[in-house]
Amino acid sequence: MYELIQVAENSYYIQSPVKIGIFKLNETEVCLIDSGNDKDAGKKVKKVLDANGWSLKAIYNTHSNADHIGGNQYLQKQTGCKIYSPGIECDFTNHPILEPAYLYGGYPPKDLKHKFLMAQESKVEYLTENVLPEGLEIINLPGHFFDMVGFRTKDDVVYLADCLSSKETL
């Protein structure tokens, strides 16, 4: 688990419970597509980056579910990276209490305030075409969550977040 898999020249992913995309910007800098489900995932991702001599410039979140943004806070504190999320996903990521509140229909009870529904806060900015590095484009994928997106790299690799599920998951 947390094995680095190279898919194309500049496109990788980390094999983990939620696949974490890596897009290599140059020989020493990368950006992530999502960050995993919690601080422990963030630590494991950081080890992979360090082992390859890569510095993290940005995280591009596909959507605001906790299993995709849970490593944000740890990685941002460790690296100072920027984090971007699309549309209303940015608000949910900046204010993670919104996800269990949305599911509950009001202020969530304690039983709904756990790491699987509520990630730690991170400082997130709105994702726009202007903040993307060269070679990365947004694919709009609303459905699973409000403003979910995927990304296509210049290697023609796509990161589709929760648009695809395994037979076992279904």
Give each language-model segment a name.
Residues 6-8, 17, 119-121, 125-126, ...:
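Residues that act as N-cap/strand-start positions at coil-to-secondary-structure junctions
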Residues 8-13, 35-38, 59-62, 135-141:
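Short, flexible loop segments at the rims of nucleotide/cofactor-binding pockets, characterized by
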